[in-house]
């Protein structure tokens, strides 16, 4: 039917255009029932209005479609719901729609499977009142398993039974997007409820594993974002009973994700309600548990269950609300209208008939009769050939433009205020429909007061809960105020202790400041500098062995921050030797200058000044000098060296230069010895020249 791949791709994005194209290929017109909601972007139609030839283009378009967010197919053809045998025979003689044939339902499920497999926008799938067989459900379950976007699935009024539900459960068990399912009126028993309870347990295990993985490294898992069912609707399945309720109670006790469970008209008793109430003691996430329309449950038990569920729903505003009863409908929509058939004529092509719906019988008021005005005038149909006959086609066209008749409000009020006016209430069940005529005390009249009483009870319970919370908060407030006063008292005590400790530390710091005085530290540093200067002089004088004998290490001769003084006694440089040779006699002045320059070290408050070693006369230890001095003067070199050493020791042992000048005799002896040495050296120099 499709010749090119490009056309197929374009058709998948536009359902309406492709549906028109396929209808044109088979020389048919798109059905108004199908086109009604396509302009809104959804596919919603009554399947009873389609013939067999109309399904082919529709299913071919649906199979490849990718742009429909909602697909809703309904069927209301139920011939077994007739009241009497004559009604049953009338329905059986009428035309059976094509959707009731197994081939059409099988092709429909195949098309839905293809749409579910490829569509990424299909979120709602509703099949209402269809007869789905086992092979149809198997194909549909495969599509549900492959769907990546389906959120809501409804098979309401589809008599699939427990076996069909088990097949569907295989498709929805691993779905990551499906949130709500609706199996209202599907002829389920407690076994079907057990299948759904097993699905809940399976998804709970998977969610617990995902929760554990998300809680690692101190993370907080988001339960609302996890996959799984959030609402299950099983209304109007009277065979579920207490066994099904107990199965759900067992799975709900450990479930943290299901938000709503609807069990209206499911044949529950006090035993099943009690099991659900015990499950609510541990389950605080279920916000809707609808067990209404179960007459075997006591009013007190139902009130306790609803109260517990309402307490769970107060924590946050839930998106899942309480649904209305599926069996209560407006009387105007469910009341059957009697029809009168008029045969206009018969011929070779058939007979023309007109079916006219007559209004219900109106009661006659006591006193006067209501006369109808011109706006209520409806002439009786006339047979053909009579004067004033109106063809039925002309009547139908006129009816389209006539609109609704004008009805006065006071007439309706007068009719409703009459004591004998009947009120028709329709009560539907999965197996039959009953029409009852009751007085003003019908269920529909008392439905509004019942709702208001439930709302008042809910408000009263909410008020009691708020008062209880207020009382608890007041007690907590008193405890907190008492604790605050205790903490303030402790804070004052700690502040006093801190002040006393700070004063003690301040007094102790004053004593420690004495050791931090710069004068004391400076005097200690000066003492060490003098000692190191003494060690440097010993080393420069060639008396390092004396320091070693005294137990002073060689590394102690170096003072940190000051350059080490090197000895020039052993090997005097040539320049100094020439300068000594060039010196002429001025013995007295040189001796006095040498006496002034020979000092250990001038100590100041900040640094020390090294001695001028170049002007310090040191006996030359070279062999030439020793030889010349011994040969010329006849004085052994050892004696001369001994004399210089004794004089040096005498100077070193003196406390200071001022102390040596105080003792005149010692100073004169030193001057004489130095003069003698200088004169002897000069003589040796002159002789050598």
From Swiss-Prot:
This is Centrosomal protein of 78 kDa. Belongs to the CEP78 family. Keywords: Cell projection, Ciliopathy, Cilium, Cilium biogenesis/degradation, Coiled coil, Cone-rod dystrophy, Cytoplasm, Cytoskeleton, Deafness, Disease variant, Phosphoprotein. The keyword Cytoplasm applies. Centriole wall protein that localizes to mature centrioles and regulates centriole and cilia biogenesis. Involved in centrosome duplication: required for efficient PLK4 centrosomal localization and PLK4-induced overduplication of centrioles. Involved in cilium biogenesis and controls cilium length. Acts as a regulator of protein stability by preventing ubiquitination of centrosomal proteins, such as CCP110 and tektins. Associates with the EDVP complex, preventing ubiquitination and degradation of CCP110. The gene is CEP78. It is found in: Cytoplasm, Cytoskeleton, Microtubule organizing center, Centrosome; Cytoplasm, Cytoskeleton, Microtubule organizing center, Centrosome, Centriole; Cytoplasm, Cytoskeleton, Cilium basal body. GO terms for biological process: cilium organization; flagellated sperm motility; negative regulation of protein ubiquitination; protein localization to centrosome; protein localization to cilium. Residues 573-587, 666-689 have a biased composition (Basic and acidic residues). The keyword Phosphoprotein applies.
């Amino acid at each position: 039917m499709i010749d090119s791949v490009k056309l197929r791709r374009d058709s998948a994005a536009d359902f309406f255009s492709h549906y028109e194209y396929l209808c044109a290929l088979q020389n048919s017109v798109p059905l108004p029932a199908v086109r009604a909601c396509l302009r809104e972007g959804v596919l919603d139609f009554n399947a009873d209005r389609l013939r067999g030839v109309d399904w082919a283009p529709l299913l071919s378009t649906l199979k490849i479609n990718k742009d429909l967010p909602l697909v809703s197919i309904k069927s209301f053809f139920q011939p077994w719901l007739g009241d009497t045998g004559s009604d049953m025979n009338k329905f059986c003689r009428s035309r059976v729609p094509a959707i009731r044939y197994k081939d059409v339902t099988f092709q429909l499920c195949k098309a839905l499977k293809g749409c579910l497999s490829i569509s990424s926008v299909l979120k709602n799938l509703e099949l209402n009142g269809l007869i789905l067989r086992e092979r149809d459900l198997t194909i549909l379950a495969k599509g549900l398993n492959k769907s990546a976007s389906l959120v809501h699935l409804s098979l309401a009024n589809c008599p699939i039974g427990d076996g069909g539900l088990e097949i569907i459960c295989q498709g929805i068990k691993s779905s990551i997007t499906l949130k709500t399912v609706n199996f209202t009126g599907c002829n389920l028993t407690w076994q079907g409820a057990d299948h759904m309870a097993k699905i809940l347990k399976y998804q709970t295990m998977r969610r617990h594993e995902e929760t554990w993985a998300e809680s690692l490294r101190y993370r907080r898992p988001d339960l609302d974002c996890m996959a799984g069912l959030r609402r299950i609707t099983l209304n109007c399945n009277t065979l579920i009973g207490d066994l099904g309720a107990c199965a759900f109670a067992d799975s709900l006790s450990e479930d943290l994700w299901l938000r709503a469970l609807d069990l209206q008209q499911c044949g529950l008793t006090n035993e099943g309600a009690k099991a659900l109430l015990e499950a609510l003691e541990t389950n605080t996430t279920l916000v809707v548990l609808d067990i209404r329309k179960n007459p075997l449950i006591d009013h007190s038990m139902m009130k306790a269950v609803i109260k517990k569920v309402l307490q769970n729903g107060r924590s946050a505003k839930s998106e899942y609300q309480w649904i209305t009863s599926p069996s209560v409908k407006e009387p105007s929509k469910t009341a059957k209208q009697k029809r009168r058939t008029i045969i206009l004529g018969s011929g070779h092509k058939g007979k023309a008939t007109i079916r006219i719906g007559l209004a219900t019988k109106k009661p006659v008021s006591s006193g006067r009769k209501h006369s109808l005005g011109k706006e209520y005038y409806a002439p009786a149909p006339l047979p053909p050939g009579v004067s004033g006959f109106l063809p039925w086609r002309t009547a139908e066209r006129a009816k389209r433009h006539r609109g609704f008749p004008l009805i006065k409000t006071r007439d309706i009020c007068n009719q409703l205020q009459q004591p004998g006016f009947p009120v028709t209430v329709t009560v539907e069940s999965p197996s039959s429909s009953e029409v009852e005529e009751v007085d003003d005390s019908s269920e529909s009249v008392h439905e509004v007061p019942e709702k208001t009483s439930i709302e008042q009870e809910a408000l009263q319970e909410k008020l009691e809960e708020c008062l209880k919370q207020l009382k608890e908060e007041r007690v907590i407030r008193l405890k907190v105020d008492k604790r605050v006063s205790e903490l303030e008292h402790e804070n004052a005590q700690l502040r006093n202790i801190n002040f006393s400790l700070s004063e003690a530390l301040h007094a102790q710091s004053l004593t420690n400041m004495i050791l931090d005085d710069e004068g004391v530290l400076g005097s200690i540093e000066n003492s060490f500098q003098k000692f190191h200067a003494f060690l440097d002089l010993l080393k420069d004088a060639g008396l390092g062995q004396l320091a070693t004998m005294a137990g002073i290490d060689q590394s102690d001769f170096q003072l940190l921050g000051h350059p080490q003084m090197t000895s020039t006694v052993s090997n005097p440089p040539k320049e100094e030797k020439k300068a000594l040779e060039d010196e002429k006699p001025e013995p007295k002045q040189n001796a006095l200058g040498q006496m002034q320059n020979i000092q250990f070290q001038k100590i100041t408050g900040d640094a020390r000044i090294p001695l001028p070693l170049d002007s310090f006369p040191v006996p030359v230890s070279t062999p030439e000098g020793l030889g010349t001095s011994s040969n010329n003067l006849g004085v052994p070199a050892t004696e001369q060296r001994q004399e210089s050493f004794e004089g040096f020791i005498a100077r070193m042992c003196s406390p200071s230069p001022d102390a040596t000048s105080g003792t005149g005799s010692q100073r004169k002896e030193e001057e004489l010895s130095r003069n003698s040495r200088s004169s002897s050296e000069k003589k040796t120099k002159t002789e050598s020249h």
